[in-house]
Swiss-Prot record:
Belongs to the universal ribosomal protein uL14 family. Binds to 23S rRNA. Forms part of two intersubunit bridges in the 70S ribosome. Disulfide bonds: none annotated. Gene3D superfamilies: Ribosomal protein L14. It comes from Bacillus cereus (strain ATCC 14579 / DSM 31 / CCUG 7414 / JCM 2152 / NBRC 15305 / NCIMB 9373 / NCTC 2599 / NRRL B-3711). HAMAP family: Ribosomal_uL14 (MF_01367). GO terms for biological process: translation. GO terms for molecular function: large ribosomal subunit rRNA binding; structural constituent of ribosome. It comes from the Bacteria. Part of the 50S ribosomal subunit. Forms a cluster with proteins L3 and L19. In the 70S ribosome, L14 and L19 interact and together make contacts with the 16S rRNA in bridges B5 and B8. Pfam families: Ribosomal_L14. InterPro entries: Ribosomal_uL14 (IPR000218), Ribosomal_uL14_bac-type (IPR005745), Ribosomal_uL14_CS (IPR019972), Ribosomal_uL14_sf (IPR036853). This is Large ribosomal subunit protein uL14.
Amino acid sequence: MIQQESRLKVADNSGARELLTIKVLGGSGRKYANIGDIIVATVKQATPGGVVKKGDVVKAVVVRTKSGARRPDGSYIKFDENAAVIIKDDKSPRGTRIFGPVARELRDSNFMKIVSLAPEVL
């Protein structure tokens, strides 16, 4: 569960390394984001020469959470870290590579480009 002020690692090569959540998109009183949800965040750490700079406000999709997600068959998927991928307005990733595994729930949210770029889909 990602909420306001949550810090996430960035799982792509857009140049950002860490994000701070500003808002969870989807409804007026929505408090938490899970895997496959879109957030508005600011870049807290960035690598030099990247596409995004420190202080930029970006949209991102959550790809890994420590709290995990429940599957329809009753099983749970959990990760060791909270991570997100920075996206454009058309839901395509800003970077050209995805690092680390991503959850299968992204396929249900129509993030097919992220799923195809990921080295492993769990």
